[in-house]
A protein has these predicted regions:
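Protein kinase glycine-rich loop
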Residues: 11-22
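RING-type zinc-finger domain of E3 ubiquitin ligases
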Residues: 306-365
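Conserved N-lobe motifs of Hanks-type protein kinase catalytic domains
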Residues: 17, 65-68
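Protein kinase catalytic-loop region centered on the HRD/HxD motif
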Residues: 135-147
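Catalytic-loop of the protein kinase fold
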Residues: 144-159
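A short, low-complexity linker immediately N-terminal to eukaryotic Hanks-type protein kinase catalytic domains
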Residues: 1-11
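Cytosolic eukaryotic protein kinase-like domains
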Residues: 27, 33-60, 71-127, 163, ...
Length: 383
């Protein structure tokens, strides 16, 4: 990792977050070369023995999570003196940088390969990215044990070169443990995670994180994407428009081209997800189909994946050659049995993966996603 980043050179730094700094690496000997390159996250200081044990536990948890819209963890270097996490490099930048377009944001985008400032994201592009992140978050919540992200924000949603969205930085997530044989729906902690403006008042008051507090942060992210403004104080600043969603076009970012209908529906989702009283909040499972419907109405259809994106999601070293009963083709024939040993449900849509309906080299050459109507029971794009 030191060699791949030129000694963690400043010229290769593409970002900085709660875990530490992020550096661009073009190639790593132990991983298949990919055109997008790699992002190496390194802790600012040594983690120590206790921190190392916590990080090892976190890595084991994240290794069991696999979804097309969840940024995959490709490799780790865990040592008390320096801890590093390796991910694919998302050259489209973060949703936050693409929305705010500040001098610092544009500098980070230049480090990712943008020669000039990219145009503002359209409403359709924003909806598509938000939908992708919501899919990944809902997937984390359906795992057993459940994984809470606890740091959802526009800065933790990344874009690839084709405009697909990926939920990143699940490094602060914790697996919710079963108590007395029952699955718990929340997680209490003395440590407060999250960014200012995105943190649920429930967490600030009693430290109790849940699917609903993740949903609150997603609701704020929807509002950030709608307005193009920073999250801090945004909910109260938009209070009038949120009380009357049919006026939400008045707070919509002009450069995105939001329609009145899009702004109104997005405002209603914000209100549902970020309602002050927890008992009246909208579950993410209810909000996701409505986001799907917005994307479908906007015509924001995914581009066909290229050959590189058709590589196995687990080893990244062989083409996808196994198609599950649900329609997803995610793994090569060597890796598919390893995935099914952990769970007989498809990691992407949680539908039964068995029986395997197709195998062989031809799977990767076929169209790898099929859109379903939001009215269908399971709403996802099949990769």
């Amino acid at each position: 990792l030191i060699a791949a980043t030129d000694g963690f050179a400043e010229a290769r730094k593409v970002g900085e977050g709660g875990f530490g700094r992020v550096y661009r690496a073009d190639a790593l000997p132990s991983l298949p070369r990919v055109a997008c390159g790699f992002a190496v996250k390194t802790a600012l200081v040594g983690v120590g023995a206790q921190g190392l044990a916590e990080l090892q536990s976190e890595v084991r948890t994240l290794s069991a999570a696999c979804h097309p819209s969840l940024l995959p963890l490709l490799g780790v270097c865990l040592a008390p003196s320096r801890a590093c996490l390796v991910y694919p490099l998302c050259r489209g930048g973060s949703l936050e940088d693409r929305l705010y377009r500040s001098p610092a944001a544009l500098q980070r985008l230049r480090m990712l390969g943008f020669e000039t400032a990219p145009p503002p994201l359209s409403s359709a592009a924003r909806l598509r990215v938000l939908r992708d992140a919501a899919r990944a978050l809902h997937y984390l919540h359906t795992l057993s044990p459940m994984i809470l992200h606890r740091d959802v924000s526009a800065g933790n949603i990344l874009l690839d070169e084709r405009g697909n969205g990926y939920l990143a930085d699940v490094g602060l997530a914790r697996a919710a443990e079963a108590t007395a044989g029952a699955q718990v729906s929340h997680l209490s902690t003395q440590r407060i995670f999250g960014k200012p403006g995105y943190m649920d008042p429930i967490i600030l008051n009693d430290g109790q994180a849940s699917q609903l507090t993740d949903g609150f942060a997603l609701g704020i992210t929807l509002l950030v994407a709608l307005t193009g403004r920073g999250a801090l104080g945004l909910l109260s600043a938009c209070d009038d428009a949120l009380e009357e969603p049919d006026t939400a076009e008045s707070i919509a970012a002009a450069d995105a081209g939001w329609s009145a209908a899009q702004a109104e529906e997005l405002a209603r989702l914000v209100v549902g997800l970020a309602f002050v009283r927890k008992k009246k909040r909208m579950p993410l499972a209810e909000a996701l189909p409505r986001l799907e419907a917005l994307v479908e109405a906007a015509g924001a259809v995914e581009e066909t994946a290229g050959a590189e994106e058709r590589q196995c999601d687990l080893c990244y070293d062989a083409p996808r050659s196994v198609r599950f009963a649900c329609g997803h083709a995610l793994y090569c024939e060597a890796c598919a049995p390893r995935v099914l040993e952990r769970d007989t449900n498809c990691p992407a849509c949680r539908r039964p993966a068995l029986p395997i309906v197709d195998t062989g080299a031809g799977v990767a050459a076929q169209t790898t996603f099929v859109y379903q109507s939001p009215r269908a029971r399971h709403n996802c794009v099949y990769w």
